[in-house]
Amino acid sequence: MASLVAVQPAAVKGLSGSSISGRKLAVRPSSAAVSRSTRRARGAAVVAKYGEKSVYFDLDDIANTTGQWDLYGSDAPSPYNGLQSKFFNTFAAPFTKRGLLLKFLLIGGGSLVAYVSASASPDLLPIKKGPQLPPTPGPRGKI
């Protein structure tokens, strides 16, 4: 049986409006959990260094844990020339929406299937070609 253990909530900067800020979990441990905890040595604490045993979360260093979000935001002008930027802004704008892109792919795929089926020769299907060889008799001499 699993037992729940109540821990003290950690104050994390930036989570003041979060649902986990400052709420305590009121749980009474079961008698089996209490008896198990008395058998264990109480002097040892579980500690893992950053990166050791696949622990990569540090509440004291949130910026390095979650990543530098401001690193990739840039207000610099576009590295492309004006004509190229205008072309992509004009002709690629309809494909920024998922629905329009899906419609374009469906219409393009449907027209490709229609073209291939219209240009295919009609005698590709075996039912149109008919038998090519005389029938071979089976094990009892029957067709």
Swiss-Prot record:
Q: Does the keyword Zinc apply?
A: no
Q: How does it sit in the membrane?
A: Single-pass membrane protein
List the GO cellular component terms.
chloroplast thylakoid membrane; photosystem I reaction center
Where are its TM segments located? 100-120
Give the chief site where it resides: plastid
Q: Which Gene3D superfamilies match?
A: 1.20.5.220
Q: What keyword terms does UniProt attach to this protein? A: Chloroplast, Membrane, Photosynthesis, Photosystem I, Plastid, Thylakoid, Transit peptide, Transmembrane, Transmembrane helix
Record's keyword annotation contains DNA-binding: no
InterPro entries, A to Z: PSI_PsaH
Localization of this protein: Plastid, Chloroplast thylakoid membrane
* Organelle transit peptide residues: 1-48
Task: Give the GO terms filed under biological process for this record.
Answer: photosynthesis
What family does this belong to?
Belongs to the psaH family.
What is the documented function of this protein?
A: Possible role could be the docking of the LHC I antenna complex to the core complex.
Query: What is this protein's record name?
Result: Photosystem I reaction center subunit VI, chloroplastic
Q: Supply the source organism for this entry.
A: Hordeum vulgare
Q: Gene behind this chain?
A: PSAH
